[in-house]
Amino acid sequence: MKFSKMHGNGNDFIVIEDLNNEYLGKEGEIAQKMCHRRFGIGADGILIVRKNENCDIEMVIINSDGSYAAMCGNGIRCFAKYVYEKGIVKKDVLDVLTGDGVKRIFLEIENDKVKTINVNMGFGDFKPKNIPALCDEEIIEKKVSVGNGNFEITSLLMGVPHTIIFEEEKYPIECGRDIEKYELFPQGTNVNFCKVIDRNTMEVRTWERGAGPTLACGTGNCASVIAANKLGLVDKEVKVIVPGGELKVNIEDDGVKMIGNASFICDGTYLF
């Protein structure tokens, strides 16, 4: 099985082409084996490239534990760079079908290489039934006791569920494990620990549902900026600093724009 390994701000993925649906139904098993950091290649998840009649291309995301993910911000940047530079879709504006619908992506090209990727991530959704969360009112600075800690949480759907915690002092990232599985969230939640530096800068650390601590999470960065803006903590153009680097998130009338890059690590053959 041919593959490429890529990363977006340290959030790493294995990209495989399945243009003839050869691996349909085997995605979870493939992801668990390939993503294992001792017995496999090692990654936070896999990105599967598939044809689609209604779009330029389709992206399927599987987490390292074999679970399906509707959307991944860092993953879609890697995916867009891959399909352009591998010659699968040679367009600087492309529509990618994801589990969260079609995402329009604008590529900045220099010497036939993708320099910057601008993704319209759509809008955040605070409706509890859509997150989903087992409550009637929006989760805005809700006080909860989870595990051994007390937190104020804000939750929304950004393609996948995200819970935001604004911290004055750093919580251990492992707190995310208990919050991910908190009874309020029947399907679990990603957890983002945020610190506002100024009105145009934030730091974000993410515990990713199904993957654990990660160096970056694109949907989490977008969700964090949306939550911070809703609470009046930041403006609409924000630089987000994560352990693996930084990117820009802009809140615009037609959706939230995530602007960053992605990198190839290696190509290879996996003996599946």
From Swiss-Prot:
Subunit structure: Homodimer.
Molecular-function GO terms, alphabetical: diaminopimelate epimerase activity
Subcellular compartments: Cytoplasm
Keyword Amino-acid biosynthesis (UniProt): yes
Site, Could be important to modulate the pK values of the two catalytic cysteine residues: residue positions: H162, E208
Domain of life: Bacteria
PROSITE patterns, A to Z: DAP_EPIMERASE
Active site per the UniProt annotation: C72 (proton donor), C217 (proton acceptor)
Biological source species: Clostridium perfringens (strain 13 / Type A)
Pfam families on file: DAP_epimerase
Annotated family: Belongs to the diaminopimelate epimerase family.
Major site of localization recorded for this protein: cytoplasm
Biological process according to GO: lysine biosynthetic process via diaminopimelate
E.C. number(s) listed in UniProt: 5.1.1.7
Function: Catalyzes the stereoinversion of LL-2,6-diaminopimelate (L,L-DAP) to meso-diaminopimelate (meso-DAP), a precursor of L-lysine and an essential component of the bacterial peptidoglycan.
GO cellular component, one term: cytosol
Protein name in the entry: Diaminopimelate epimerase
Ligand binding (substrate): N11, N63, G73, N74, N190, E208, R209, G218, T219
Keywords assigned by UniProt, alphabetized: Amino-acid biosynthesis, Cytoplasm, Isomerase, Lysine biosynthesis
Pathway(s) per entry: Amino-acid biosynthesis; L-lysine biosynthesis via DAP pathway; DL-2,6-diaminopimelate from LL-2,6-diaminopimelate: step 1/1
